[in-house]
Amino acid sequence: MLSLFSVVFTFLALFLIPGLFISRRLNVPLSLTNILRFIKIIASKYDDEEERNEKRGTMGEKQKRGRNIMPKHVAVILDGNRRWAEKRGLGTSEGHEAGARRLMENAKDCFAMGTNTISLFAFSTENWERPEDEVKCLMALFEKYLASDMPYLRSDKIKISVIGNRTKLPESLLGLIEEVEEATKSYEGKNLIIAIDYSGRYDILQACKSLANKVKDGLIQVEDINEKAMEKELLTKCSEFPNPDLLIRTSGEQRISNFFLWQSAYTELYFPTVLWPDFGEAEYLEALTWYQQRQRRFGRRV
């Protein structure tokens, strides 16, 4: 049985002292009804805070799970440089310069978020049909940024692979490509693939010719040709993850334009309207959020 002292002490601690404080702070008359009302409000606020904390915890868990669903290979079609320049009253070359600056910035963001391979469609086979001055500008930009980015590539141990038909490339650019590839060939874990004079159809044709020559030379039998054998001949064999999980094409155009035709069989395709020079970290995070909400079935029923 509680003593009288205990009862009085409990009353003072739980009701009277808080009641006096409430009465003075809120300028309300002291009464048991007001004290109980205040206690009910505090309890309600505490419950609301608990509920918010629980929701935050749930969101945090979802974000953690989302980070585990990162694309291993992200491919990007860099589109919108000219339109970006036109909107600002600038020349085409200035648009390409802005796009070239954005290239390595976005690659850094991708690697920082856990992606292993990044493929950039920088110059298609069809791009040779553009005005001569524009083509020369693009070739000069490739040389400029390959050279200037070398310190970063080495310090961050990023392997560079340039894929495509090299027969038309300027000698100076070819020499630089070979130098960069040689300097970074031993790096593992991060692979930056730059497609220059690349065509998905060309890639498939050269792979088929290579397999045909191996059959002709007696190195393999026709029966040995399967998907794995084909993938070993494609230009993306330079990567541990040759098939993109996510392909992004900026500028709102919704086609892959002869890029990675074989490799994109089950790739998630994302088409933001933002132009390439404006595609930054925030836009990439939006692409990742979209990707993480996709249910990838690979032709199976899940």
Swiss-Prot record:
It is a single-pass membrane protein. Coiled coil: none annotated. It is an enzyme of class 2 (transferase). One of its GO terms (cellular component) is endoplasmic reticulum membrane. Its EC number is 2.5.1.-. CDD domains: Cis_IPPS. Gene3D superfamilies: Decaprenyl diphosphate synthase-like (3.40.1180.10). One of its GO terms (biological process) is protein glycosylation. Keywords: Endoplasmic reticulum, Membrane, Transferase, Transmembrane, Transmembrane helix. Pathway: Protein modification; protein glycosylation. Belongs to the UPP synthase family. This is Dehydrodolichyl diphosphate synthase 5. It comes from Arabidopsis thaliana.
